[in-house]
Amino acid sequence: MNNNFWKGKRVLITGDTGFKGAWLSLILGMHGAKVQGISSSKFSGNNELYSLLSVNKISNTVDCDVRDFDGVLSAFNSFNPEVVFHLAAQPLVRQSYQDPVTTYEVNVMGTMSILEAVRQSPSVQSAVIVTTDKCYKNNEWEWGYRENDPMGGHDPYSSSKACAELLTQSYQQSFFNDCSNSTGVSTVRAGNVIGGGDFSEDRLIPDLYRAISTNNKLLLRSPLATRPWQHVFEPISGYLKVAEGLFESGAKANDCWNFGPNNSDIRTVQEITELFLACWGIKDIIDFDTSTQPHEAKSLSLDISKAQFKLYWSPQWDLENAMEKTAIWYKACFEDGDILKISTEQIEEYY
């Protein structure tokens, strides 16, 4: 991260009340950026971190559904952002089975609204569209997916994010294609993120935290499934590098990027569970859920060599260190500690 680059930059973040969005807002605010958010109060189920980090003191958050193009464009026109990060999404696989229509509307047409607002906003020089590692056609193999592998998606969430990738690619080729004059636009695909402040349903670490704090057992599903686990600061640092490059080079830098851990940190759900519980010194709070579940990929990993070679980006914290930082944060939350102080200290250590 080029700390000096962000001083005074006008940065618009969609989904700033969510997990990554709140962290990104605090990081940018600490580095002197002028931040505005777009988030909808209709989807306010996971905005605890936004409050705990006092993001409202950093960002003027506009209550707007990203599917509302007129509202989105109005927010762009009033703020005149120079850099845009699009994180707003319906982010859960299992919820996408329950409500596929909203999932596709938010993740595809919401992305369309942001891309079109970027196209119509002369102030924007750099836009980063956040999708997911699940956008790839999953072959359930041991190799990491590369950026040029086919898009796919078995479940509605994964499919909707693959659609967002194809939509962005179309905009890159149709509208952001003048290397001397066009806005720079790229997509970024990250693995499973951990870190303090995620309180979403149906995510492993938040579910473990709730089980610990309520003294209940957690039913663990798919314990042998592997995922590319990484601390939330890792992909955010990649997003920032991409945004800086787009700002400097415009459409010449248009691309797509994977951000994930080193291969040694691609672990099973059970291994991650045991590591988190070890950080707490707790045992015997999990059982195994043997009931039939909606389809979720059993094996998933990313090839990050492109970001390593072209962006000089690499993960800074191994999984053990990342999990220790995560546990420290949740312990502080459990004990009513000074969350903002711990959060800023962790940011300062990483960045």
Residue map of PLM features:
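Generic structural signal for small/hydrophobic residues in well-ordered secondary structure
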Residues: 6, 16-18, 84, 171, ...
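Residues in well-ordered alpha-helical elements
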Residues: 69-70, 82, 94, 101, ...
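NAD(P)-dependent short-chain dehydrogenase/reductase
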Residues: 139-144, 148, 156, 165-250, ...
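Conserved C-terminal active-site "lid" loop/helix of NAD(P)H-dependent oxidoreductases
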Residues: 232, 255-256, 292-314, 335
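Generic structural signal for alpha-helix termini and adjacent loop/cap motifs
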Residues: 99, 117, 121, 174, ...
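C-terminal "lid/loop" region of Rossmann-like NAD(P)-dependent oxidoreductases
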Residues: 254-257, 267-273, 281-299, 340-346
